[in-house]
Amino acid sequence: MTTLFISDLHLDPSRPEITDLFLRFLREQAPGADALYILGDLFEAWIGDDTPSPAADAVADALKVLSDSGVPVYFIRGNRDFLLGEDYARRAGLRILPDPCMIDLYGRPVLLQHGDLLCTDDIPYQQFRAQTRDPAFQAQFLSQPLAARIAFAQKAREASQARQSEMKQGDRAQFETVTDVAPSEVDATFARHGVDTMIHGHTHRPAIHSLQAGGRACTRIVLGDWYEQGSVLRVDAGGWSLDTLARE
C-alpha cells in the first residue's frame, strides 16, 4: 500500500486547470491509498469557511468521497489557507493536524509541516505569521463582514507581491536565500524532534535532500507546487518517489 503527500496546489478560480487536475488525481490515483496528506496551501487564499465558492465546494465534495471510501485525508494549514476551519474540514472529510506534527510512516517516525516555519531568514514574514496565527487576531478578522475580509486579503496580497517583486529586482541570490529554508533551522528542527526524516512543502523547490544533522544521516523531502504540473510524493514500506502529474 502507498501513502500520498501533496502541497501547494494554490487552487483558485483563475486557474481551473489545476483544480481539474486535482479532481482527476482524487478520482484516479488516490482511491485505495493508505492515506492522503495535504501539507498546506491547498487554496490560493482562504478568508473564512463562509466564503461562497463553487470551486471549493467541488473540491470538498471530491475529498469527502475519498474520505468516505476509507482513505483518511489529513490537512496541515499553509500560509495561504491558515484560516481554513472546522466547518469546511467537516464538509470535506479532512482531519486537521497541527504544524508541525509527527506521524509513524511504515515504522519510521516522520515530521510533517507546511514548511514556512523553516524560512527563518525571512524575518518580516515570520512576524506576519506570528500575528496572523494568533487566535485573537483570527477571531477578530473572521468576525468582520465578508466584504471587509475580501478587501483586507486583496491589500495583503498586493503588498506581498510588491515585496516579492522588489526583492527579485534587488539581490537575486539574497532573494533565493530568504525564500528558502534556513539550514540552521533545518538542523535545529531535526534535533528538536529527534527524527531523521522530514516532509514539507511551501518553498516550491521539489527535491529529496540527504544531509547530516547533529551527526545523523537525515532526509528532507520537499514537495512541489502544482502551477505547471502536479507533484505527489508516494511512500510505501520500501521507500519513496517524488513524481509529477501531467495535465490532460
From Swiss-Prot:
One of its GO terms (cellular component) is cytoplasm. It is a peripheral membrane protein. It comes from Stenotrophomonas maltophilia (strain K279a). InterPro entries: Calcineurin-like_PHP_ApaH, LpxH-like, Metallo-depent_PP-like, UDP-diacylglucosamine_Hdrlase. Hydrolyzes the pyrophosphate bond of UDP-2,3-diacylglucosamine to yield 2,3-diacylglucosamine 1-phosphate (lipid X) and UMP by catalyzing the attack of water at the alpha-P atom. Involved in the biosynthesis of lipid A, a phosphorylated glycolipid that anchors the lipopolysaccharide to the outer membrane of the cell. This is UDP-2,3-diacylglucosamine hydrolase. Mn(2+) 2 binds at D41, N79, H114, H202. NCBIfam families: lipid_A_lpxH, PRK05340.1. Keywords: Cell inner membrane, Cell membrane, Hydrolase, Lipid A biosynthesis, Lipid biosynthesis, Lipid metabolism, Manganese, Membrane, Metal-binding. It comes from the Bacteria. Substrate binds at N79, R80, D122, S160, D171, Q174, H202. GO terms for molecular function: manganese ion binding; UDP-2,3-diacylglucosamine hydrolase activity. Its cofactor is Mn(2+). Mn(2+) 1 binds at D8, H10, D41, H204. GO terms for biological process: lipid A biosynthetic process. It is found in: Cell inner membrane. Pathway: Glycolipid biosynthesis; lipid IV(A) biosynthesis; lipid IV(A) from (3R)-3-hydroxytetradecanoyl-[acyl-carrier-protein] and UDP-N-acetyl-alpha-D-glucosamine: step 4/6. It is an enzyme of class 3 (hydrolase). Belongs to the LpxH family.
